[in-house]
Amino acid sequence: MTLEKDESRQDDALEACNAEAVARKAGEELNVFDKGRMEGPDAESTTHGTVRAVCVSKRKGTRKTVVDGPVTIEAHHGVAEDAHAGDWHRQVSLLAWESIEKARARGLDVKEGDFAENITTEGINLMALPLGTQLKIGDDVLLELSQQGKVCHKKCAIFYLAGDCIFPREGIFFVALTGGKVKAGDSIDVVKLGDGTCEYTPQEALDELANTPR
């Protein structure tokens, strides 16, 4: 091999490495709202999904029951007749079906509602959404993301019934800005990407999450 050809190959390799680095840097700088997760046909989106199930319980610390037909979400209160509804920042809880499937793959016998989520979602990457993000569900309901995960001070019935509780790590909470009906099959759309803050979330809740392993 001549010296000239060897230098040419080195230049080509260097150019390829530089191009790869530039492309990687550009990818890192893309906003997650625009990029989503588009690695394949089954990849989760950060902008759109669907309601897989709506679940309700009369008591806290228990599994929720999947409800057939539409369920009412009341503005600034939460899911009608659900134990977690009220005047606080965790009015409506969401958990991705993809998270439940991961638990099932580990051998847990779990389904929609078993981790006490109000709405089981499908197709949307909930964990990529920052605080303050607003979701429109169906025609009327508007929710704002107020908390990511939670702290379990003691293992509740859900942990013992399911063998683990993934909600503290992968569940998220919302306040209901507007009310309406929600049912399985409804669309979920990000209408506003949050800036990482939510006026409804008390500082002590954020401090507890930051200082407690889950």
Walk through the language-model features, giving the residues of each.
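Conserved "cap/hinge" positions at secondary-structure junctions
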Residues: D139, D186, V190-K192
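Conserved ATP-binding/catalytic segment of the ANL
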Residues: F174, K181-A184
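Short beta-strand-turn/beta-hairpin segments enriched in glycine/proline and small hydrophobics
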Residues: C156-I166
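A short, polar/proline- and glycine-enriched secondary-structure boundary/capping micro-motif
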Residues: K154-I158, Y200-T201
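Short, structured beta-strand/loop micro-motifs enriched in basic residues and often containing a Trp
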Residues: D114-I124, D164-L177
